[in-house]
């Protein structure tokens, strides 16, 4: 176990370095000083009995579930286990936006014959993004973190699952398209609240929209985000509960916002090479 932790610590150190370089203009100085002060990542990762199958970040430490050993061991009983050792849940075209859920990830784990170390590695980049930025804690921030994880994985050829928070990523992609990448990048690394960050950059009206979206998403996913997925069937519980999340009210809100902005002349809709493109004046 210690050797495994050492390999993961080394990988985390690599990811932190990449993230710090890629997003240096968005990372607050206090966080930059903290990251530079780390002389060893030994205390930054722990494989523990966390009572859940999920990885999570808390107080400058990433917790990896020991439960993964039990869950992945029982998948070996499946007749298709290890059938495709090179299996991936995405390709270059679908890594950013896809409809994968944890059910797809379970299927991936079976086909690939996923080991606990591979499970940790495929989800470590997302946690490294938390380590360098915000702590998550709500579905909107998790979606923003996952989108940045996927974008970085695609750009740098890094390992990721491509299955984390797909419904949240769908919402964030719309927000990024409407309000721009700079705002989303700032949010993921901000040391202020979501509302304060958005208001400072885009004003109170848009901050109010973000607050409403955040509340709606939190209400829709409360049961999932507060659940502990434990036991040998933890992966099934997690997949089933996630499938119940419905953000249709959030998408309706964004539909109405885009329509209002277009009608008021604040957003133009033009056809460029056959593609519809939204942009702010």
Question: In which residue ranges do the predicted regions lie?
Answer:
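Post-HExxH zinc-binding segment in Zn-dependent metallohydrolases
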Residues: 136-179
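Auxiliary, metal-adjacent structural segments of Zn-dependent hydrolase domains
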Residues: 2-118
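A broad structural signal for alpha-helix termini and local helix breaks/kinks
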Residues: 23, 27, 31, 153-156, ...
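Hydrophobic face of amphipathic alpha-helices
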Residues: 4-21, 149, 246, 254-258, ...
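Short alpha-helix boundary/capping elements
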Residues: 128, 132-133, 153, 179, ...
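Active-site recognition of the HExxH zinc-binding catalytic motif
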Residues: 118-135, 146, 150
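Short, charged/polar micro-motifs that form catalytic or ligand-binding hotspots
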Residues: 2, 110, 114-122, 134-139, ...
């Amino acid at each position: 176990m210690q050797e495994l932790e050492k390999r993961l610590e080394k990988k985390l150190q690599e990811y932190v370095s990449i993230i710090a370089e890629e997003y240096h203009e968005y990372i607050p100085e206090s966080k930059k000083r903290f990251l530079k002060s780390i002389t060893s990542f030994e205390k930054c990762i722990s494989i523990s009995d966390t009572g859940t199958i999920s990885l999570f970040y808390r107080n400058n430490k990433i917790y990896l579930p020991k439960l993964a050993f039990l869950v992945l061991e029982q998948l070996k009983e499946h007749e298709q286990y290890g059938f495709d050792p090179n299996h991936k849940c995405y390709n270059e075209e679908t890594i950013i936006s896809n409809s994968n859920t944890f059910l797809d990830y379970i299927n991936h784990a079976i086909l690939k014959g996923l080991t606990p170390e591979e499970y940790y590695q495929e989800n470590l980049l997302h946690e490294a993004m938390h380590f360098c930025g915000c702590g998550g804690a709500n579905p909107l921030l998790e979606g923003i973190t996952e989108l940045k994880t996927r974008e970085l994985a695609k750009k740098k050829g890094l390992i990721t699952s491509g299955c984390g928070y797909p419904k949240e990523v769908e919402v964030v992609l719309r927000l990024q398209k409407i309000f721009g990448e700079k705002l989303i990048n700032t949010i993921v690394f901000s040391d202020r609240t979501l509302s304060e960050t958005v208001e400072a950059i885009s004003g109170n009206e848009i901050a109010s929209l973000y607050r409403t979206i955040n509340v709606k998403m939190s209400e829709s996913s409360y049961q999932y985000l507060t659940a502990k997925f434990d036991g040998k069937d933890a992966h099934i519980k997690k997949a089933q509960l996630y499938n119940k999340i419905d953000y249709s009210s959030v998408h309706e809100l964004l539909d109405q916002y885009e329509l209002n902005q277009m009608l008021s002349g604040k957003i133009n809709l033009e056809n460029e090479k056959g593609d519809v493109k939204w942009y702010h004046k």
